[in-house]
Amino acid sequence: MGEVKSDIEIARAARKQPIMEVGAKLGIPPEHLLPYGHDKAKVSAEFIAAQNEKRNGRLILVTAINPTPAGEGKTTTTVGLGDGLNRIGKKAIVCIREASLGPCFGIKGGAAGGGYAQVVPMEDINLHFTGDFHAITSAHNLLSALIDNHIYWGNEQAIDIRRIAWRRVMDMNDRALRQIVGSLGGVANGYPRETGFDITVASEVMAILCLAMDIKDLEKRLGNIIIGYRRDKSPVFARDIKADGAMAVLLKDAMQPNLVQTLENNPAFVHGGPFANIAHGCNSVVATTTALKLADYVVTEAGFGADLGAEKFFDIKCRKAGLTPDAAVIVATVRAIKMNGGVKREDLGRESVEAVRKGCANLGRHIQNVKKFGVPVLVAINHFTSDTEAEVRAIKDYVRTLGSEAVLCKHWAEGSAGIEELAYKVVDLANAGHSQFSPLYPDEMPLFQKIETIAKDIYHASEVIADKLVREQLRTWEDQGYGDLPICMAKTQYSFSTDPNLRGAPTGHAVPIREVRLAAGAGFIVVITGEIMTMPGLPKVPSSERIRLNEQGYIEGLF
């Protein structure tokens, strides 16, 4: 076996087509592509608006089982499946999220796929790309600055500085900024108060950009952001301090989807990037709805496991955007299944069919959960060289007992040729008309009951633990007209429970609610459980230690 090339070496050797040629495959005229160099472009809002009357293609969701810290290749499989569909003669577009610098320099690496199933230019996508995250960070922090400025110049809106709900953000993992005191240094610097930073991907502005239908909807949602409360507990909105217009101006270009290509020169939209453990975990509605007008098949992903990303894709994104998924693919790896079967991380390379059989309970739970939404399921076994035939067979046999099918996929090593079988089966499943999509709960269900429904039906918890303050806050929001909003659970991605170390398919556990936040602009209620943080920290040995420029000026260590 020859030397295995790194992701960045493979991406750098790619024969990219000019982005205008990629756009032409979708019928996008050159004048409606706003190029950023030769290999990436934004699609104009005018072109997008003109596609409204076209019929939609088929929508395929790629999700996963509970992952290991390294991820299970969900983006890789999304990209590979898009290439596979194009390989068998179907017109397909991939829709994925943009990468955050936090995990890129932290533990998880980039978000452009891997091996021979990547989107390119990989280095750009994983770093600054077209500046969308900078624009989102700037718009968010403009609002933060305007809040403190409003208070400094007389506080006409009577904002209670003890009840300001808007923090600041940056696109980096930095635990030192979670809780800070601002405005120190004297009268000229304003009124000292406790505040803090979240990571940009947890920003409500990010969620708004990813859920807005167009620029008008974006500005309206920005105006609906609740920045804090008065002493009588009435909400103060971003529009009350006239912040929404300037924020929308900063986001004007960021609202337009980014067009790039796969290694096999197939089109891909990379747009938006909320995390699925602390936000709703899906790429933008604009990118997805545009892709559905331009292709016969759209393959999109939702972050982390199906308990987080898929649930939010169905209950938040599809509900709000009127989308109907035709099929779902759950990505599983032998190593993640073994980890869910109790194998330690350092022992994952050794064969253990028994651990696979035990860990399949986690996969089975995800299959059953996705089917609760009325969406038919296939399983993609993302192949690793350490997998054995017996382990793969055990997964296939187990999935068959649940009325679904598992397909071994080698797209990481072979590109589209390694995922042809899955592509054919996805086409058959999506066209069979089996999808009877319905969200998990109705809009009119009380907020706390919605939380209980997710906890009991998806996580298989026995109860939700919430103190009096949380329950009263939910009732207050219902009285204020927010009772019809969906729930966005903030929870560890490593387990069905709120304990990241509780693997497999646990039952009877409790879900403790630490805090609830109203994202009135995005249009959902964030429920923070367990120890989840909206500003992550870096690991002891961050990925950044391996990233450098070599003597030729090329980046090394990015993955």
Curated annotation (Swiss-Prot):
Per the record, the pathway is: One-carbon metabolism; tetrahydrofolate interconversion
Q: Which PROSITE patterns match?
A: FTHFS_1 (PS00721), FTHFS_2 (PS00722)
Q: Which UniProt keywords apply?
A: ATP-binding, Ligase, Nucleotide-binding, One-carbon metabolism
Q: Does the keyword Secreted apply?
A: no
Record bears the keyword 4Fe-4S: no
Looking up Pfam families in the UniProt record yields: FTHFS (PF01268)
E.C. no: 6.3.4.3
Q: What's a Gene Ontology MF term here? A: ATP binding
Spell out the reaction equation it catalyses.
(6S)-5,6,7,8-tetrahydrofolate + formate + ATP = (6R)-10-formyltetrahydrofolate + ADP + phosphate
Q: Which GO terms describe its biological process?
A: tetrahydrofolate interconversion
Which residues are recorded as binding ATP?
Answer: 68-75
Q: Which InterPro entries match?
A: Formate_THF_ligase, Formate_THF_ligase_CS, P-loop_NTPase
Q: What does the sequence similarity comment in the record state about its family?
A: Belongs to the formate--tetrahydrofolate ligase family.
Matching HAMAP family, A to Z? FTHFS
Q: What protein name applies here?
A: Formate--tetrahydrofolate ligase
Taxonomic path: Bacteria, Pseudomonadati, Pseudomonadota, Alphaproteobacteria, Hyphomicrobiales
Gene it is expressed from: fhs
